[in-house]
């Protein structure tokens, strides 16, 4: 009898431990940045990069993971972009913000090529006249976005480029366009470094946006 109770108790402990492990294990893990926290200085400070990525981005991903484990276990086999495309409400908001931020940070480099080339540059010049005109239009859209949100350069199904401003997490992955570049214009992205000077922040980003990354996205590298 004593042995039977011990076996039952051990089974219960193992089941509890397995349940706890499932509850605490991450569905999606935050990838490491492709550079050190301080390598984007002086354009984005170490403090902002660390807070923005390790706290804000991780927070969105942790919340999305919690919802997935609890409410939609069948979605665990999907990648994060598919979760974004197929979700709504709180799961969408957190998964989209996590994906947006990872995409955003991945386009930066301390050794950035600060102008596009090849077919992407040709398309920009065809539509905006020059790369400088494109940058001016992009910056105007960023500073003109009311409140918090995202600014996107996208490739539309017809091959044309478009600058899209969206509030909150936006819905770029729910569209038929391919995102090439995303800029976070929530205040947490720049307030520690630039206070309310959003335009100055956008202007600084041109120094660290790596157009090699954007060109790969434009060239048809599989959609994220």
What positions do the PLM features span?
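Bacterial Sec-dependent N-terminal signal peptides
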Residues: 1-22
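Feature for soluble, non-membrane regions of globular proteins
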Residues: 20-224
């Amino acid at each position: 009898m004593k042995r039977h109770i011990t076996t039952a108790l051990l089974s219960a402990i193992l089941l509890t431990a397995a349940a706890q492990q499932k509850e605490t294990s991450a569905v999606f893990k935050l990838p490491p940045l492709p550079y050190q926290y301080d390598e984007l200085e002086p354009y984005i400070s170490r403090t902002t990069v660390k807070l923005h990525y390790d706290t804000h981005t991780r927070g969105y991903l942790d919340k999305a993971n919690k919802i997935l484990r609890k409410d939609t276990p069948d979605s665990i086999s999907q990648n994060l972009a598919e979760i974004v495309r197929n979700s709504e409400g709180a799961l969408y908001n957190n998964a989209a913000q996590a994906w947006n931020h990872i995409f955003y940070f991945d386009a930066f480099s301390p050794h950035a090529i600060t102008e596009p080339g090849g077919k992407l540059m040709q398309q920009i010049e065809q539509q905006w006249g020059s790369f400088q005109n494109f940058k001016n239009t992009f910056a105007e859209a960023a500073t003109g976005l009311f409140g918090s949100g995202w600014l996107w350069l996208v490739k539309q199904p017809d091959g044309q480029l478009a600058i899209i401003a969206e509030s909150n997490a936006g819905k770029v992955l729910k569209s038929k366009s391919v995102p090439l570049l995303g800029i976070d214009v929530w205040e947490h992205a720049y307030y520690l470094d630039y206070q309310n000077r959003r335009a100055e922040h956008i202007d600084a980003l041109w120094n660290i946006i790596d157009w090699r990354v954007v060109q790969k996205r434009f060239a048809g590298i599989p959609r994220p």
